[in-house]
């Protein structure tokens, strides 16, 4: 039988969606626990509500179909995007309706940013600080104003339109989440098409994303910011679309615009160097990176990503194949190499998520450090409270993501790992070497902990004995960070040598000039000495202990000498049953639980170090004749080399603002400081307590209720060991972060 060309074409067409996959049922959604036969029966004990929360998003426990799990995750992503767009819309609406953005634009150095006014109900109006420009409101430290300035937003009307756009996008995302689960749900092979996904994400999301941002900066943000920097009033600047459609207007600011696209197609790209620059350093007017450098950077990235997005083999017979790349990746000591990893990454979303969380967490920490060393937005560097907030925010986000990576890595090991499919590949070989890896890492932690704290204890002892000449310090026994200083110097010398076209250093943290804006220091060389060497070894210690706990949780997720059948017990279990003492707190969940405490330790030391170092050695004022006055007078080098110095000259000294905030516009921080301490202390009640104590207490209370014929229909139960730890951990972190937030902001707002 001859096949027609139409039939042949239809056979080649791949159908990647299933129509009307799941009916839309409000009645089903209204039933709590509809996803579980057990939970749908309703509560018999108070444990039901805990299980409801634990399992609502644990799609693995609701179905064994990988396709169904994939669809639920995909749909949930649209819901997440809807919330993000709604949040962004709300931020812009606040900027449009409640803020002093227009006033701030006219004088961003002396006017503080505010986008919320508290109503006077019972005296709360005390929180409305005088932020300058005839405006009273809560001082905000989010960095939105600086970002809006960099985008070229000059009026509240533009913020309104952006807010409406965000609202519309939020609605579209909600619709898309419903549509792609109920009406046109992708099939499993669509989710597993790694090459197509890589091409679209690289060329589409990253490539076109960078290109559109670069285009916006060139055509809208650059001309508007150039006029603002020159002192032109925001009201007198043409509307954004005029720069877009009027080439003559652009040519007045950037002459190369008059030449059109001829230099581009002629390969004479240097003609565009008036708006695509490679200056390096910071704009002396705003203290931020040159926006023309940023536009150039994103244009270059877009080219790289668009090329990268054509790298993988899809419908045509050219390009890379992910499975082939992985299976060809073999070294002399790595057995089968990456064989089997392709199957893992296309069937286990926990494995995929683990890698993504680890990468995104690391990226967030990198962003935190770049935000102060290379401030990207105008007038960000001189807004010290915002700088401290952004650093702290990105460090916490990074810490949580990295721990999340370990959590999902362990879940993958328990639920998705198949030993038979991973014989002698890299993953199998790491698992077989786990005792060597963990014991060596443990030795490193002991070494770092003993030596790092030993330095401090030595210094505290010598200072107490009145022997400063025997201390580790820049003035006595020096421990100079010579490698860090060498790296700083390499970067300082790069312009004109290894970076021949750069006009200034990448960051003035490495050395060079003092950049000041309106008499406030934006950035200056950050000198590193003995104090930094010592605290960096505390960083190394806390980070290595966090990694030790998390890595042990992943490598011993399926089995250990103590519990050989751990994989059968699952990701989360309290102990290995009755009659096996000493097996509690050995599940992968418990490793994540312990790892979060050490993550909290790690990040706390980092943000304390940053806050004090910047106040001591960078932030401050400079007079016209060049005399510099730092906020804490350069006391970091001599005070931070003892534990007593950290307690007295940082924690106690800088807590004065939050402790004495009552009766001022910062009084909310005083209350948060107090309240967050209570939340933190409340956590200890769960962390230092046994379940049996509470069960006995509950039973005596239930007895009293029964005596009065007032017994509840839902039987009260004490929290399980795991639930108690989860509640304790949540309050410990919330209380600790809330306390730090209040301490930092009350201090930072007073010095900004």
UniProtKB/Swiss-Prot annotation:
Subunit (UniProt): The PsaA/B heterodimer binds the P700 chlorophyll special pair and subsequent electron acceptors. PSI consists of a core antenna complex that captures photons, and an electron transfer chain that converts photonic excitation into a charge separation. The eukaryotic PSI reaction center is composed of at least 11 subunits.
Native source species: Thalassiosira pseudonana (Marine diatom)
Catalytic activity: reduced [plastocyanin] + hnu + oxidized [2Fe-2S]-[ferredoxin] = oxidized [plastocyanin] + reduced [2Fe-2S]-[ferredoxin]
A GO term, aspect molecular function: magnesium ion binding
GO BP terms: photosynthesis
Chain segments annotated as transmembrane: 73-96, 159-182, 198-222, 294-312, 349-372, 388-414, 436-458, 533-551, 591-612, 666-688, 726-746
Residues where [4Fe-4S] cluster binds: 575, 584
Family assignment from sequence similarity: Belongs to the PsaA/PsaB family.
Pfam families per UniProt: PsaA_PsaB
InterPro entries: PSI_PsaA (IPR006243), PSI_PsaA/B (IPR001280), PSI_PsaA/B_CS (IPR020586), PSI_PsaA/B_sf (IPR036408)
Bilayer topology annotation: Multi-pass membrane protein
Protein name per Swiss-Prot or TrEMBL: Photosystem I P700 chlorophyll a apoprotein A1
Binding site for chlorophyll a: 685, 693
Binding site for phylloquinone: 694
Summary of the function given for this chain in its UniProt record: PsaA and PsaB bind P700, the primary electron donor of photosystem I (PSI), as well as the electron acceptors A0, A1 and FX. PSI is a plastocyanin/cytochrome c6-ferredoxin oxidoreductase, converting photonic excitation into a charge separation, which transfers an electron from the donor P700 chlorophyll pair to the spectroscopically characterized acceptors A0, A1, FX, FA and FB in turn. Oxidized P700 is reduced on the lumenal side of the thylakoid membrane by plastocyanin or cytochrome c6.
Compartment(s) of residence: Plastid, Chloroplast thylakoid membrane
